[in-house]
Design a protein with these regions (language model features):
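A membrane-topology feature that recognizes alpha-helical transmembrane segments
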Residues: 1-252
């Protein structure tokens, strides 16, 4: 369904996603002003699009679905299930580009398809980690082989992720113990295990930083911001590639 206003909106949103993904990758922070230009352009273009297409078959369903999905994203962000930047990205996409202007309509909406595509693409991360660790000869529990890599102790604070080893010192000897898989949900979410805490609150982490400096390597989980696969998923969805459609075609 080609629509010039929708194409302009899609271009603005895609450029915003690329900028936000880059910021999130480099600093794990997305500046609030990043969203403003696309929100204004997308808002105007979305109104023009709906004025032209609101009476076509299925338009009301798409509009209601877009509004419901945006509301759910806001709710999930409030409940801590999404990051604020991720929620803003999905709300912007859902409202500003309800359908792709560059391909046939994909079920159920562009935003949903982009999110599902992102989930599928994210599966490459554990495969990459496992392959990398096997090639390098790194050894750790299997779950960690699929989710992390070893880093020099002195550089851990510059990584993005969670410490996957507990480091202690007894009688001048450094001892390391892997976090058990059944404890990861609670243990790895501890602020004191987050590498960002080591950077931003060094005075509180002085003891941990001192121990890490003495370690040759320490295992750290690999943190990939959702905005990175989400942006890739959006690019695929914009041109009609939808994992949702593929899965439904296999099942039906």
């Amino acid at each position: 369904m080609f629509s010039l206003p929708l194409a302009v909106s899609a271009a603005a949103v895609l450029l915003t996603f690329l900028a936000a993904a880059w910021q999130d990758w480099k600093t794990r922070t997305v500046y609030r002003a990043t969203w403003y230009p696309a929100a204004v352009i997308g808002g105007i273009c979305a109104v023009l699009f709906w004025l032209e297409y609101i009476h076509t078959a299925g338009a009301l369903f798409i509009l209601l679905l877009s509004l419901a999905f945006a509301a759910l994203c806001r709710l999930f962000a409030a409940l801590g299930m999404f990051g604020k930047a991720d929620a803003k990205a999905l709300v912007l996409l859902s409202l500003a580009v309800p359908v792709t202007p560059f391909a046939a309509w994909i079920f159920p909406s562009l935003a949903v398809s982009a999110l599902v595509n992102a989930g599928i693409l994210s599966l490459a991360v554990p495969l990459f980690c496992l392959g990398y660790n096997l090639l390098k000869g790194n050894r750790a529990p299997f779950w960690l082989m699929c989710s992390g890599t070893p880093a020099a102790g002195s550089s851990v604070k510059d990584r993005f992720g969670f410490l996957a080893e507990t480091v202690t010192e007894e009688n001048g000897e450094i001892k390391k113990e892997f976090v058990r898989m059944r404890d990861t949900v609670f243990s790895l979410k501890s602020p004191m295990r987050h590498t960002r805490t080591l950077r931003e609150r060094p005075e509180e982490c002085e003891g941990t930083l001192r121990l890490l400096e003495k370690c040759e390597t320490v295992w750290v989980t690999v943190g990939i911001p959702l905005l990175v696969p989400l942006t890739a998923g959006l690019i695929f969805a914009l041109f009609g590639f939808s994992a949702v459609d593929i899965l439904l075609s296999l099942l039906l």
